């Protein structure tokens, strides 16, 4: 395919049009008085959102050169979202400001490489100072404030804070769609895995269709059990103790399953069989997790252990087990605390080492089941359109809160970026590097300008006053008052602000040093020239 090439000024101008198209669509959502953007969907109702990265991903421009500019800024939003999970609109606003200012200077004759050096120098100083003014997050109230600011909803803030408090730092919090109108929190205590009973005849509560075992023994094996003789010796030992049995195996079927069911119905003893969770190597690891949690052993031929010679001391214990059609929950396993801690440390190390996002997610789930817990925020709304928008906001708020726990918080509402302005302005450089520093200085003001603009106010006046205020005092665009931002709970996670600034500067510097842009030449549509006249096809019948 033929290519089209544009050089220097012409190339950068075309890409800038794309940058502006995307950034102008995204930045209307910034701040407490930001608006929403409606995205058309090929199927179903349109999506209404104020999430920067969601909007950025939807934008495709007809002109190939403009589209490249738009995609560069979408990359800023996407990268910030990957690292910090929020702050995508701020990152987009910063990138647009740096690109615009930079382009003015490069057009006026500044050397892009010198400009880039100055920008990198200024951003490094800004980030260092952001870390200095950052405060660690303390207590449930602070967590609720961060989440409430991100989601623009206090109820969501307290839900997320409660979820984080109940499952701890190692816990997993997931967000699901609810069938009702209300948003609620559901916390699963203990270890839960997605395998239910092998037979509905094993239930102990026919109203709820669940089997509840109090103080059961737990037999854990990776073998398939079809013959009752294999587990008869250990069954007899359990019956003598008068306790129920949870049997976790690759599968339980045939005569073995029938015998367990018949004995349950007769009231001889109570046993529930479930399939082992996971597959392959992950199954072995999860069975080992259950064994550590319950203080039992995995009966596997890999370790030279045989079901027939299993002793009751090799079984796990728990205070309670609840088995439904789809899930098994083990509450208060009797495993030794130091062994559980060692297992948790081992899984944490694997989380750090893995490069696969899927593996990391699965390892964190295992970690949560052992050390924390699993919380599910069920999002409810009156319509599907509102539900999608609300779910996106809550996901952002959750990511924002995690980022705050990790690196602390700074004053929100664009205040922190202006707070570091004077420190960056004190940096001195020569020639084009100084121009680069000035570009970053102008960009630091842009988020607060945009927040003010979206609230119908004049940004320049607010920026000038903010530069002279003491650190931490900022402008609350929701009420129009000057307040101590952290005291009022108007905060941003340091990680979000830092990532937005770093990623914006990185892409802006790449943009300014671009000298040629290559794109596919659009094909000219020749109307009906695609197929030749097929009029003579009728004679093909004679080919038979």
UniProtKB/Swiss-Prot annotation:
Which Pfam families does this chain map to? Cpn60_TCP1 (PF00118)
Write one Gene Ontology MF term.
ATP-dependent protein folding chaperone
BP-aspect Gene Ontology terms: chaperone cofactor-dependent protein refolding; protein refolding; response to heat
Keyword set includes Metal-binding: no
Concerning InterPro entries, the annotation shows: Chaperonin_Cpn60_CS (IPR018370), Cpn60/GroEL (IPR001844), Cpn60/GroEL/TCP-1 (IPR002423), GroEL-like_apical_dom_sf (IPR027409), GROEL-like_equatorial_sf (IPR027413), TCP-1-like_intermed_sf (IPR027410)
GO CC terms, sorted? extracellular region; GroEL-GroES complex
Residue sites binding ATP per the record: 29-32, 86-90, 413, 476-478, 492
Q: What is its EC number?
A: 5.6.1.7
Q: Which UniProt keywords apply?
A: ATP-binding, Chaperone, Cytoplasm, Isomerase, Nucleotide-binding, Secreted, Stress response
Subcellular compartments: Cytoplasm; Secreted
Main location group? cytoplasm
Catalyzed reaction equations? ATP + H2O + a folded polypeptide = ADP + phosphate + an unfolded polypeptide
- Role: Together with its co-chaperonin GroES, plays an essential role in assisting protein folding. The GroEL-GroES system forms a nano-cage that allows encapsulation of the non-native substrate proteins and provides a physical environment optimized to promote and accelerate protein folding.
User: What is known about its subunit structure?
Assistant: Forms a cylinder of 14 subunits composed of two heptameric rings stacked back-to-back. Interacts with the co-chaperonin GroES.
Q: What protein family is recorded?
A: Belongs to the chaperonin (HSP60) family.
Name of the featured protein = Chaperonin GroEL
- Gene (UniProt): groEL
């Amino acid at each position: 395919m033929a290519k089209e090439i544009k050089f220097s000024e012409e190339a950068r101008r075309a890409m800038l049009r794309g940058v502006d198209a995307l950034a102008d669509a995204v930045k209307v959502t910034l701040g407490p008085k930001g608006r929403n953007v409606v995205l058309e969907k090929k199927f179903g109702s349109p999506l209404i959102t104020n999430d920067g990265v969601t909007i950025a991903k939807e934008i495709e421009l007809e002109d190939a050169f403009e589209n490249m500019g738009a995609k560069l800024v979408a990359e800023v939003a996407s990268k910030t979202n990957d690292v910090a999970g929020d702050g995508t609109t701020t990152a987009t606003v910063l990138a647009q400001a740096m690109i615009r200012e930079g382009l003015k200077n490069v057009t006026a004759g500044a050397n892009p490489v010198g400009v880039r050096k100055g920008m990198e120098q200024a951003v490094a100083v800004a980030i260092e100072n952001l870390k200095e003014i950052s405060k660690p997050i303390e207590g449930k109230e602070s967590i609720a404030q961060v989440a409430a600011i991100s989601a623009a909803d206090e109820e969501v803030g307290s839900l997320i804070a409660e979820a984080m408090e109940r499952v701890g730092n190692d816990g997993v919090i997931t967000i699901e769609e609810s069938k009702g109108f209300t948003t609620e929190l559901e916390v699963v205590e203990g270890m839960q895995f997605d395998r239910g009973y092998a037979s509905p005849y094993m239930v102990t509560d026919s109203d709820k269709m669940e089997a509840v075992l109090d103080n059961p023994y737990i037999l854990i094996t990776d073998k398939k059990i079809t013959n009752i003789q294999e587990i008869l010796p250990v069954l007899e030992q359990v019956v003598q103790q008068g306790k129920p049995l949870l049997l976790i195996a690759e599968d339980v079927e045939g005569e073995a399953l029938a015998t367990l069911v018949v004995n349950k119905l007769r009231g001889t003893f109570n046993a529930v069989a479930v399939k082992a969770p996971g597959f392959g190597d992950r199954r072995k690891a999860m069975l080992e997790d259950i064994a550590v949690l319950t203080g039992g052993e995995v009966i596997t031929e890999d370790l030279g252990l045989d079901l027939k010679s299993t002793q009751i001391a090799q079984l796990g214990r728990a205070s309670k087990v609840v088995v439904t059609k789809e899930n098994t929950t083990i509450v208060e396993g009797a495993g030794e605390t130091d062994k559980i801690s060692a297992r948790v440390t081992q899984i944490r190390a694997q989380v750090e080492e893995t490069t696969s996002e899927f593996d990391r997610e699965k390892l964190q789930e295992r970690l949560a089941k052992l050390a924390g817990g699993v919380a599910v925020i069920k999002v409810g709304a009156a319509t599907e359109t509102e539900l999608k928008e609300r779910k996106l906001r809550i996901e952002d708020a959750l990511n924002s809160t995690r980022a705050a726990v990790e690196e602390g918080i700074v004053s929100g509402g664009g205040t922190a970026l202006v707070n570091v302005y004077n420190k960056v302005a004190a940096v001195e450089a020569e020639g084009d590097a100084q121009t680069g520093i000035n570009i970053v200085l102008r960009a630091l003001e842009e988020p607060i300008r945009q927040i003010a603009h979206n609230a119908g106010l004049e940004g320049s006046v607010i920026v000038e006053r903010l530069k002279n205020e003491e650190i931490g005092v900022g402008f609350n665009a929701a009420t129009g008052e000057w307040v101590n931002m952290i005291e009022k709970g108007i905060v941003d996670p340091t990680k979000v602000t830092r990532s937005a600034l770093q990623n914006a500067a990185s892409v802006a510097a790449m943009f300014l040093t671009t000298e040629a842009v290559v794109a596919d030449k659009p094909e000219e549509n020749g109307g009906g020239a695609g197929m030749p006249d097929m009029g003579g096809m009728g004679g093909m019948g004679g080919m038979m």
